[in-house]
Every structure is written in C-alpha cells, then in structure tokens.
Design a protein with these regions (language model features):
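Extracellular/periplasmic, surface-exposed regions of secreted and cell-surface proteins
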Residues: 1-244
Length: 244
C-alpha cells in the first residue's frame, strides 16, 4: 500500500512606491492602485494498493507479474480508481544443455512482457503559463467584487466523467552477447496503444463557456516498431579496449 499527498499553499502581496527598496514589507510602501494580496491552495492525493510476484526456475526460466489499483484526486469519486499491472517472462537459452557446445554464444535470452499503465496528469494554462490542473473534474471560478456586489466568473469547465488515460504495451525481443562478449545488443519489437487520452478540447464561444476548452478523454494513439541496439568491441588489448 502507498499514499502520496501534495499540498501547496501560496500567499503573496504587492504594493508600489517603496520608501526603502531594501525592506520587503507591504507597510514600507504608500501605493494605492497596486495594493494587492492573494492566496491559493493546491491539493493532490493518490492512493495505491500493489502486489508483485517473481519466479525463477533453475536460473533459466523467469516469470514476473504485478498488479496495482490506484486512485487519483484529480477525478470524481465515481471514476477515481483504475486497475493496472503487467506480466512478463524470460528464457535464458544459453543455459540449456543443447547450447553447451555453442561456444560463440555467451548469453542468449528471449523475453516478452505485457502491461497496463495509467496517467492522470492534465495541464491548465494560467496567465499564459502551463501548470498542473489539480481539480480537472470540477468547475472552477474566480470571485469578483464590484460596486458592493459579488459575482463568480467561470474560468475552467470541469468534466465529471473524466478518468484515467490508459496505455497498453507489448514487448518481445532478445538480448545477446556473442564472440567472447565482443558483440552484444538487443532486438525488440514493441507495440503501445494509449486510450482515453486526457486532452483539453477546444469548445466554441457559442457554447456560453468563455474558457475556450474543457477536459475530456478523447482519441487513441498506436505506436509500433522495432528497436535495435548493438555494441561491439573493435580492438581489445591487455591494457586497452576500443568499443562502439
């Protein structure tokens, strides 16, 4: 079990016409037009229940599995929890008996894995600067006071149904070390699909919402490919080695 909590409290003020520029106190100034004080608090919390299983048989066969259930305060309580995990396995082929006479293979491993991962981060633009949106599912307002009257101005349109962005990843490949470790590397195929992308969707002014966008889960992304990583020793001497 794990829990993370973030709380950031900010209080600041400003004034003009400093009497002494080396004294940073509001009472050291006589300004009226720019006299101002503001404060805000950011709250964020995640909670997770996790487990992991690892198995090794005879130094040749390896299995692993993990599962976690996470909650994020960025989402409404009805959509706060997500289920994630992974499974993987590896076979150290060079430890098999049929490889005993294959001297030019120092290590040969076949590996594969599948996993699910979640993302809850969504940014918001405040005064031209992007920062974390800690309350993405809630409508957010600015308080305005003029002529003795209070008013609320909508600055961010929340989405109650917002939930985790989820990525599914599959990898299969091989690691190898050959020719007395002169050549080693990895060949791996990967496939990654992300669903329920977290995105600030633009909305028309005619909707009556002046913020210009609202958070939503929209669209999928698919990435596939092959990765090749090779390292070789070109020259090897008693006191030196040249690799690339």
């Amino acid at each position: 079990y794990e829990q993370y909590r973030y709380k950031n409290q900010v209080l600041y003020g400003e004034n003009t016409n400093l009497y002494n520029p080396y004294i940073g106190e509001l009472n050291n100034a006589g300004g009226i037009d720019k006299k101002n004080a503001k404060s805000y608090t950011d709250n964020y919390m995640t909670e997770g229940i996790l487990s992991r299983l690892q198995y090794n048989y005879d130094g040749k066969y390896f299995l692993s599995a993990s599962y976690r259930r996470d909650a994020s305060s960025r989402f409404h309580k009805d959509h706060r929890w997500g289920n994630f995990g992974s499974v993987g396995g590896a076979w150290l082929i060079n430890h098999e008996k049929f490889m005993e006479n294959v001297k030019w293979v120092n290590m040969l491993k076949l590996k594969a894995s599948w996993g699910v991962q979640g993302n809850d981060r969504l940014l918001i633009t405040v005064n031209g600067v992007q920062r974390d949106n800690w309350y993405a599912y809630q409508d957010q307002y600015d308080v305005n006071y003029a002529n003795g009257q209070y008013s609320l101005i909508l600055k961010y349109k929340g989405t109650k149904d917002l939930t985790w962005e989820t990525s599914y990843a599959f990898n299969i490949g091989t690691d190898f070390e050959l020719f007395n470790n002169r050549l080693n590397g990895t060949i791996e195929y990967f496939s990654r699909k992300t669903v329920d992308l977290l995105y600030n969707k633009p909305i028309p002014v005619s909707s009556g919402i002046s913020t210009g966008y609202e958070p939503t889960n929209v669209g999928d992304i698919m990435n596939k490919g092959v990765e090749l990583d090779l390292n070789g020793i070109i020259l090897r001497g008693k006191d030196y080695e040249w690799a690339m």
